[in-house]
Amino acid sequence: RDSVNGRIPILLGVGGNNTRAIVDTLQNDDFTGVDAILSVVPYYNKPSQEGIYQHYKAIAEATELPIVLYNVPGRTGVNMKAETTLRIARDFKNVIAIKEASGDITQMDDIIKNKPANFDVISGDDGITFPLITLGAVGIISVIGNAFPREFSRMVRLALRGDYANALTIHHKFAELFKLLFVDGNPAGVKAMLNVMGMIENKLRLPLVPTRITTFEAMRKILDELNIKC
């Protein structure tokens, strides 16, 4: 809170696969200064679509804070389908958006076409942010933006303004880096990239380990060629 000093909204991650524990946190912890919470679809225990709905129902009823849903089946093991997302969005007014990282453009488009007016779709995948904005998404919660906040946010702003030609140029500039970030997993990828740029040490806690040297050198080569300003 002190670092951002009101310049940007604070989105706090409050999620997990224990609904009761999340509700307890929301009802008893101090959320002063928090603008909204980001809550991931329950992971590992693979609930049904009805279970996902009931999970978010309990969360929405436990707080007045705005809630951003987070669908990332590649990490959680279960996909929240469009109809479930839309049902939650319609039933709970404090559910204001979804960070969609399913990689399924058809599913995302279905949400965008049928969502309530007070509900936004946010990309959770850098590589499809540009096409998703052309369909009606409002932005991105980004990985590569940690390394290139200025240039990547410029792409987003151009796309939101309808300047697709210039936005696409930036999208293509980053294309290989989008892939390299996840070759050896993330956050190892973005930490390696930031290390190449001289911004941080390349240290991780187990079970995460640094990227392979081949990935690291590939990043160095592309960054040298692109000469992109952070």
Question: Locations of the language-model features?
Answer:
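Catalytic alpha/beta core domains of metabolic enzymes, predominantly
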Residues: 61-62, 75-178, 182
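Short, contiguous clusters of charged residues that form electrostatic/catalytic patches at enzyme active sites
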Residues: 20, 24, 54, 83, ...
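Glycine-rich phosphate-binding "P-loop"
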Residues: 71-72, 94-95, 205-206
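C-terminal alpha-helical cap/extension of soluble enzyme domains
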Residues: 11, 28, 134-137, 141-230
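Active-site beta->alpha loop and helix N-cap motifs at the rims of alpha/beta catalytic domains
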Residues: 1-77, 87
